[in-house]
Design a protein with these regions (language model features):
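Globular "head" domains of long coiled-coil molecular machines
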Residues: 2-247
């Protein structure tokens, strides 16, 4: 199998890109793709012909044990399985919407599960007025979907951003370092932000000393299109943004 990880901070168009590559034939967005954070847990997109199309979900409570995701994959009864009807775009959307599921718990429970809780308004995870914290409902998801590229052995790892990368040890120690390629997705309308740099430097760029197969993708190029500019001016603007993002 060829493992390719898609990594991006929130609102970089990562889910939209995956939708365009794997689900364009449905004429609709199949993976949740809205402003803000949509992918709440690491999600593998693959195809295993021995199983029916489905999404397998590992409850977040499994982080309370010492077992890794790889170990949990050997125990089918630990996962919740939702069948997928690949003939219906609406049914696909309903099933895959689970990657956005959240649950509210008290601060002590969230911290026991390994989540870092911040007190500032800018913190990704923080205690709300009712004393609870919103965390992902699932630790990991595996989507079994019969796409031609997936049938040939391609496995896509969709990651949920900096906060999850930093709190799920298996992502930083195993899944990302062992991926054959990592696509780091930036948005043309934001360029390189400080959080983008943090993800790159700590988890992708030279992490583990491996540089081969690390690719930067500048997404949302259409945000630079302007009806009042000529094609040459738009091309020049895109080139400037590419130069600005390169490092």
């Amino acid at each position: 199998r060829l493992h390719v990880a898609f990594v991006a901070e929130f609102s970089r168009g990562k889910s939209e890109l995956i939708n365009a590559i794997f689900f364009a034939g449905y004429g609709n967005r199949i993976l949740p793709s809205t402003a803000g954070r949509t992918t709440m847990c690491p999600t593998e997109l693959m195809f295993d012909k021995s199983k029916a199309p489905s999404i397998e979900l590992l409850p977040i409570e499994s982080r309370g044990s010492n077992a890794s995701i790889s170990e949990y994959k050997r125990f089918a009864d630990e996962w919740q399985v939702v069948p997928i009807d690949t003939t219906s775009a609406e049914a696909m959307q309903d099933a895959l919407r689970h990657v956005s599921d959240v649950v509210r718990v008290d601060r002590a429970t969230a911290e026991k599960l390994g989540f870092a809780i911040g007190d500032s308004d800018s913190a990704v995870l923080r205690v709300d007025g009712d004393g609870t914290v919103e965390i992902p409902r699932w630790r990991h998801a595996v989507i079994n979907f019969p796409h031609p590229m997936l049938e040939q052995g391609l496995v896509i790892l969709d990651t949920p951003g900096l906060n999850a990368i930093g709190t799920e040890p298996e992502l930083t120690l195993s899944l990302l370092p062992n991926a054959h390629a990592v696509l780091f997705i930036l948005a043309a309308d934001t360029g390189v932000t400080q959080s983008d740099l943090t993800v790159w430097r700590e988890h992708i760029g030279t992490a583990g000393g491996r540089k081969k197969g690390r690719i930067v993708v500048l997404n949302k190029i259409d945000s630079l299109w302007d009806e009042l500019k000529s094609a040459a001016e738009i091309d020049a603007e895109i080139a400037r943004q590419v130069d600005t993002c390169a490092w």
